[in-house]
Amino acid sequence: MKVYSSIKKRCEHCRIIKRKGKRFVICKVNPSHKQRQG
């Protein structure tokens, strides 16, 4: 999980979701694409 001030989708399988006021990128195909904002 990488933390960025600006998150973006890295492939077509990535999904941006909000949990507890934080934005996350989750990707089942490439778990290395996981990101968190803030």
Swiss-Prot record:
Gene that encodes the chain? rpmJ
Entry's Gene Ontology cellular component terms: ribonucleoprotein complex; ribosome
GO MF terms here are: structural constituent of ribosome
User: What InterPro entries does the database record attribute to this sequence?
Assistant: Ribosomal_bL36, Ribosomal_bL36_sp, Ribosomal_LSU_bL36
Q: Which UniProt keywords apply?
A: Ribonucleoprotein, Ribosomal protein
Which biological processes are named by the entry's GO terms?
translation
Q: Which residues form the signal peptide?
A: none
A Pfam family cross-referenced in the UniProt record is Ribosomal_L36
Taxonomic superkingdom = Bacteria
Q: What is this protein called?
A: Large ribosomal subunit protein bL36
User: What is the protein's species of origin?
Assistant: Chlorobium phaeovibrioides (strain DSM 265 / 1930)
Family (UniProt): Belongs to the bacterial ribosomal protein bL36 family.
